[in-house]
Design a protein with these regions (language model features):
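Residues that scaffold, gate, or flank divalent-cation-dependent active/transport sites
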Residues: 2-137, 141, 266
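Short acidic, glycine/serine/threonine-rich loops at helix termini
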Residues: 48-50, 74-77, 184-192, 234, ...
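Catalytic palm subdomain of template-directed nucleic-acid polymerases
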Residues: 142-163, 192, 236
Length: 457
């Protein structure tokens, strides 16, 4: 039976253990082998919807998808029961066989975030936040090295206990990967745990070499994308063993600085610790937005959306109290009929005021976008953002106009923060092709579902 320690006692117990065993609080990997968990919630969105309906996801055919996007809508998640029938998790509604009967749940991103926060809170009942890295909404890494002796359990028993806790409290099934470094924990989750009856996989460096060096396809491995696999194929390499046999200079010539990552991972090595992740600070900063349009848009219609996205970006910059002098645009076309177009414009001012940013974005869009080919994807980025204290304008700037616009933009931001993003809008948002009014109710590009507690849209 596992003794349950709440978060307010964990630190005291760890200090006691360190005193008794003379263990320093932090060690490098060379001093002591560490044990990491990578815990993933199975088909998270679908499992949450089943939990809300008091259904068993292993016995229920349920899909999370936005029916307002038509029969070709992307399935954000399907239940394990549907996956067991050979249906792919990220399929489209039209891909599901007609013979399969299923329930469709509209996305409720706010609800999923609430569940994720509750699960993180559960972790905090047993672990220090410095030992937890949240990788995504449904996946987290935990360094349990110092907790195994604390709880008097081995790595399997503690993992099973956590999985049972999540299931008992929130009715969400989970899977766990255990590894001697972060990479091996992730691979144990993604590959090994799938074949384990208890949904727990374990890998150390030797076991990794014995069981996965010849595993194919190589794209099953974390951080190996299809493009990387294609470049490896040119050298006759199709698995991790093949990477270990490639000349180092060839690897660096082909993959640049990413070669070091590929080589380390091929050997099952990963020197990065959770503390390194938490201490990392990016040298450059940007704010970006992207969206997939609900249908094919003409160049003129998409221009309206870029205008909206720029206004939204200006508000976000002001909210974060940062400014920029670089605007970038990305345009993707229907069915990849032609290569995407993109460009970057440098302003002669450093600002977060919409008038300057919209003017630059519209000029850039008109200069770089194909006026004929239908458009389906749009993106905008504000690069090299910095603190508002660095704001700068040129000699010809109308300072009275700048102050009026800044005051108006602040007022609109305050109103929208208090009463909702649609409380006050610009005229462009009421154009029929505009998307911002609807997207203001989205989280991560999907419906938030704030008023959807019963799963009704």
């Amino acid at each position: 039976m596992l003794t349950i320690y709440r978060r307010d006692t964990v630190n005291k117990l760890r200090q006691q253990l360190q005193t008794e065993e003379k263990i320093p609080e932090r060690r490098t990997m060379n001093e002591k082998q560490r044990t990491y968990y990578c815990i993933d919630m199975k088909t998270f969105y679908a499992s949450v919807e089943c939990a809300e309906r008091h259904l068993n996801p292993f016995e229920t055919n349920l899909v999370v998808a936005d029916l307002t996007r038509g029969s070709n809508a992307l399935c954000l998640a399907i239940t394990p029961r549907m996956k067991a029938q050979g249906i792919k998790n990220r399929c489209r509604l039209s891909d599901i066989p007609k013979s399969v009967k299923y329930e469709v749940a509209p996305p409720r991103m706010a609800l999923y975030i609430e569940y994720a926060a509750n699960i993180y809170s559960l972790y905090l009942d047993y672990f220090d936040p410095q030992d937890i890295h949240v990788y995504s909404i449904d996946e987290s890494f935990i360094d349990v090295t110092d907790y195994l002796p604390l709880f008097h359990k081995d790595k399997y028993e503690l993992a099973k206990f956590l999985m049972n806790e999540i299931a008992d409290r929130y009715h969400i099934p989970s899977t766990a990967g255990i590894g001697t470094n972060l990479y091996l924990a992730k691979i144990a989750l993604d590959i090994t745990a799938k074949h384990a009856r208890d949904h727990i996989g374990f890998l150390d460096e030797e076991l990794y070499k014995q069981t996965l060096w010849d595993h194919r396809p190589i794209t099953d491995f974390w951080m190996v994308a299809a493009g990387t696999a294609r470049r490896l194929e040119r050298f006759g390499v199709y698995d991790m063993r093949g990477i270990t046999r490639m000349p180092t200079d060839t690897m660096y010539r082909t993959f640049g600085k990413n070669a070091e990552l590929l080589i380390d991972h091929a050997w099952g090595r990963e020197p990065c610790l959770i503390s390194d992740i938490k201490n990392y600070k990016s040298k450059s900063h940007s704010v970006s937005f992207s969206q997939i349009l609900p249908r094919d848009y003409s160049c003129k219609e998409a221009r309206t959306v870029i205008h909206e996205m720029t206004l939204n970006g200006a508000a976000e910059l002001m909210k974060r109290k940062v400014i920029t002098n670089k605007v970038g645009i990305f345009v993707g076309y229907t069915h990849d009929e032609r290569a995407p177009t993109k460009g970057m414009a440098k302003l002669d001012v450093t600002t977060n005021l919409a008038s300057f940013l919209v003017e630059a974005a519209m000029r850039l869009y008109d200069r770089t976008t194909d006026p004929v080919t239908p458009i389906r994807r749009l993106g905008i980025a504000f690069e090299d953002v910095c603190d508002e204290g660095c704001e700068g304008y040129n000699l010809f700037t109308d300072w009275d106009a700048v102050e009026r616009e800044r005051s108006l933009q602040h007022t609109m931001l305050d109103i929208n923060q208090r009463f909702g993003k649609n409380a006050i809008l610009s005229g462009i948002n009421y154009m029929p092709e505009g998307t911002q009014r609807e997207r203001n109710g989205f989280i991560g590009g999907h419906r938030a579902g704030y008023d959807d507690k019963n799963g009704k849209s």
